[in-house]
């Protein structure tokens, strides 16, 4: 049985990112494996023994609530430290970092990603695409990554985190916008997402795993403890 943790869908479920858990479940079932989704709502403890965890996007207040809960509970941190895969989208990426800006203040993050997020004046909205860096646990990715971004965050990665992709379209992490008060939409944009240990995070909505089946299968393989090449192809 593959047990998929859908983390805080009541506060980090604004943009349909719950669909990532559905994609994982369906792609497992299509290969003949039993799989179930376990929603974990605000105020509930995060079980640390599930096979994989997904987090979605949300607005400022929701982010703060999510960060406070995940920090105080500690279950997701223990799961990630044990090597269980975690996949986070947009606000989820920011919440898992060291800090992020929300509601006019700097908020402590969970600390699973060496990343800090500042605010931008102009919202990044539109298609985003990148070539995988193949960093860390994403070494087997070969296909371009695509999604839809909608965020005001500019994220800088520290030395312990690596980008998921190198941008070919869109804003992605808008990493250079985090270093200055920039309103220019043409500010340098270099990277998309983050990879650190068992955590993969991205600004791609879509849902991301529906648009990027190879990434979905990579996460599925990690959750099942097998190599990506060992998963049977889906016709």
Region spans (language model):
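Conserved beta-strand scaffold positions in the cores of enzyme catalytic domains, especially
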Residues: 6, 37, 112, 147-149, ...
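Redox-cofactor binding/interface segments in oxidoreductases and associated redox assembly factors
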Residues: 54-55, 88, 202
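Short coil/turn connectors at secondary-structure junctions
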Residues: 1, 49-50, 82-84, 105-108, ...
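Pocket-forming structural segment of enzyme catalytic cores
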Residues: 105-193
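N-terminal beta1-alpha1 cap of cysteine-dependent amidohydrolase-like domains
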Residues: 1-81, 116, 210-235
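Cysteine-nucleophile active-site neighborhood
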Residues: 60-136
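A glycine-centered loop/beta-turn motif at secondary-structure junctions
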Residues: 186-224
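Glycine-rich beta-alpha junction loops
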Residues: 8-10, 152-154, 206-208
